[in-house]
């Protein structure tokens, strides 16, 4: 089942963001470092290109992502003309504090009290936009929470006389083109609970972990490498249920509860540092999709294309 979630408040948030875009200087596009392309909202790109606003791509939650893969993503993005990217974690306030300077480089004309730099934070739900704003402000002004759609309206605050920052509600888009993107977004808690089926999302996640991070699965759930080598995604969840004593009446494994355990463990980062996609897996997915009968011709990972004002960039892939 294709995952889609575009509740009414997102449509009004999109219209409001389009309006605000006229009165800001730089977009801080927050992506999830564990799934940078799947968490890239085409609406954000469309809105900022309409107004020709420069953009800093920030791969947030880098503390949860595989550092080697994050490094590959940063190199990948920074190779593209007009794209500036860095990775960070809101858990490291020192890294976040560098953002105004990096944004300033993208809009060098906005650099005094008369023309303060106006930054707009945009991104998918639950990616850490409000947390980022609170860290920059060094105050808990915006409400945050580990669920999608916590912020429902825009809020602009003055960082100091030279900088203002606007937090926006998380935005998805009306049609997520690739099923695996919907599943990655759902696994990472960017999709409303009613728009997904935990068991389906957890089965996708288990399959991905089995292929890419079997050692992390083995150590978290006390399964041997041999056991894992012989099972599929569904049986991984079954085994988690049995290891954790999650049973229904009659002794049958409680698949639903075990699915929730796996999803929560991934979201909390207790499995270890995991990236759901790499530049190479992204390209392979797009090639597969394009080869399907009637399949869309995929754009390669990243946006490519336009020249934007040059900025100094830093590559803090570790994010811890
Ligand atoms: N591990 C980790 N967690 C983070 C980071 N940044 C934010 N979070 C957590 O992510 C969750 C969502 O944060 P919010 O700031 O509410 O996210 P948001 O993008 O404003 O979400 P919406 O308002 O729903 O669109 C919270 O539980 C934060 O503590 C980070 O860099 N690392
Ligand atoms: Mg928020």
Feature roles, as predicted:
Residues 98, 102, 131, 204, ...:
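Alpha-helical scaffold segments in soluble metabolic enzymes
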Residues 29, 57-59, 121:
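Structural beta-sheet core signal
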Residues 63-122:
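Canonical P-loop GTPase G-domain recognition
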Residues 119-138, 142, 168:
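Glycine-rich phosphate-binding P-loop
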Residues 116, 139, 154:
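Short coil/loop residues immediately preceding or within conserved phosphate-binding loops
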Residues 1-27, 34-35, 40-55, 62, ...:
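Helix-rich effector regions associated with P-loop NTPase G domains
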Residues 103-110, 125, 136-140, 148, ...:
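Short, well-ordered alpha-helical segments in soluble proteins
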């Amino acid at each position: 089942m294709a995952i889609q979630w575009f509740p009414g408040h997102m449509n009004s948030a999109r219209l409001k963001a389009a309006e605000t875009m006229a009165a800001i200087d730089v977009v801080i596009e927050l992506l999830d470092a564990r799934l940078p392309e799947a968490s890239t909202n085409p609406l954000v790109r469309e809105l900022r290109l309409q107004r020709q606003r420069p953009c800093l791509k920030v791969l947030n939650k880098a503390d949860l992502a595989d550092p080697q893969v994050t490094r590959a993503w940063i190199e990948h993005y920074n190779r593209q003309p007009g794209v500036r990217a860095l990775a960070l974690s809101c858990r490291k306030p020192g890294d976040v504090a560098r953002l105004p300077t990096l944004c300033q480089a993208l809009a060098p004309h906005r650099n005094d009290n008369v023309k303060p730099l106006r930054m707009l934070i945009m991104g998918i739900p639950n990616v850490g936009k409000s947390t980022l704003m609170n860290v920059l402000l060094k105050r808990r002004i915006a409400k945050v929470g580990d669920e999608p759609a916590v912020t429902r309206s825009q809020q602009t605050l003055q960082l100091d006389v030279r900088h203002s920052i606007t937090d926006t509600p998380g935005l998805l888009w009306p049609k997520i083109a690739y099923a695996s993107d919907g599943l990655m977004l759902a696994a990472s808690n960017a999709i409303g609970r009613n728009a997904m089926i935990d068991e389906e999302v957890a089965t996708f996640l288990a399959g991905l972990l089995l292929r890419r991070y079997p050692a992390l699965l083995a150590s978290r759930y006390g399964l041997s490498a041999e056991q894992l080598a012989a099972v599929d995604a569904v049986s991984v969840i079954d085994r988690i249920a049995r290891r954790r004593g999650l049973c229904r009446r009659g002794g049958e494994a409680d698949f639903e509860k075990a699915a929730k355990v796996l999803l929560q463990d991934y979201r909390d980062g207790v499995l270890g540092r995991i990236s759901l996609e790499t530049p190479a897996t992204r390209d392979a997915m797009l090639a597969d999709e394009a080869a399907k009968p009637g399949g869309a011709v995929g754009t390669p990972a990243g946006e490519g294309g336009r020249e934007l004002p040059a900025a100094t960039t830093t590559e803090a892939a570790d994010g811890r």
